[in-house]
Amino acid sequence: MLTLGVNIDHVATIRQARRTVEPDPVAAAVLAEIGGADGITVHLREDRRHIQDRDVRILRQTVRTHLNLEMAPTEEMIAIALDIKPDYVTLVPEKRQEVTTEGGIDMLGNFDRFCRVVERLQAANIPVSWFIDADFAQIQAAANTGAKFIELHTGQYAEAQQESDRQALLTILKEGCEYASSLGLRVNAGHGLTYGNVYAVACLPNMEELNIGHTIISRAVLVGLERAVREMKLAMRGQL
């Protein structure tokens, strides 16, 4: 059954805007789980612009579903993951100047190093997922690192303005799902998904989990986090 990982980064974004202690992402995770979240996702960025080390450490103790730690494949972040031991990590690219993650990681440019990263993390029983574009060469490289998962980048699909473009990008995602599954990879997806566009991605073959954040937190400002999560679960089933 398709599951929902709720990304709570933007609860921390609001907190960090005033450098205060509220709202607390840890409390948000509890509410998200009450609302039906199947997992909690946080991105500990190198610049600590939203989620802080403290958040991840407490979430590791309090999350009752599973904790997905998004992070860059750097020595600092690997050390943190090995210490905290999230349920799994999703390795993502980072640029200091970006507002949000702009695309999938390039598996080909640092393939040998990425293989070593996967080996270190999975030797500590931390499954690894790569956040990548739905490109066959990238998917094959991700599989060759020994990772258990990939997360397909849905940003281009989410941002497409024309229906014909959306359908073409959806086809690319579908083919990526099928190819990844044929290689033994488990498939997640995320980035830019909203209540209005999620259903088509939820219907893709062999999809396991969707990681969604901004649209849920935006909705939560108006209706509360529990309801916002429940509504996303409905949207994923085409019932909203």
UniProtKB/Swiss-Prot annotation:
InterPro entries reported for this sequence: Aldolase_TIM (IPR013785), PyrdxlP_synth_PdxJ (IPR004569), Pyridoxine-5'_phos_synth (IPR036130)
Active site per the UniProt annotation: 43, 70, 191
Main location: cytoplasm
Signal peptide: none
Binding site for 3-amino-2-oxopropyl phosphate: 7, 18, 192, 213-214
Pathway linked to the protein: Cofactor biosynthesis; pyridoxine 5'-phosphate biosynthesis; pyridoxine 5'-phosphate from D-erythrose 4-phosphate: step 5/5
Keywords in alphabetical order: Cytoplasm, Pyridoxine biosynthesis, Transferase
Binding site residues for 1-deoxy-D-xylulose 5-phosphate: 9-10, 45, 50, 100
Domain of life, source organism: Bacteria
Record has Cytoplasm as a keyword: yes
Listed CDD domains: PNPsynthase
Subcellular location: Cytoplasm
Catalysed reactions listed for this entry: 3-amino-2-oxopropyl phosphate + 1-deoxy-D-xylulose 5-phosphate = pyridoxine 5'-phosphate + phosphate + 2 H2O + H(+)
Enzyme Commission code: 2.6.99.2
Site positions (Transition state stabilizer): 151
GO biological process terms held by the UniProt record: pyridoxine biosynthetic process
Top EC class for this record: transferase
A cellular component term, taken from the record's GO annotations: cytosol
Single GO MF annotation: pyridoxine 5'-phosphate synthase activity
UniProt key word Cytoplasm: yes
Family the entry assigns: Belongs to the PNP synthase family.
Matching HAMAP family: PdxJ (MF_00279)
Function statement: Catalyzes the complicated ring closure reaction between the two acyclic compounds 1-deoxy-D-xylulose-5-phosphate (DXP) and 3-amino-2-oxopropyl phosphate (1-amino-acetone-3-phosphate or AAP) to form pyridoxine 5'-phosphate (PNP) and inorganic phosphate.
Subunit text: Homooctamer; tetramer of dimers.
Name assigned to this protein: Pyridoxine 5'-phosphate synthase
Record organism: Microcystis aeruginosa (strain NIES-843 / IAM M-2473)
Organism lineage string: Bacteria, Bacillati, Cyanobacteriota, Cyanophyceae, Oscillatoriophycideae
Underlying gene: pdxJ
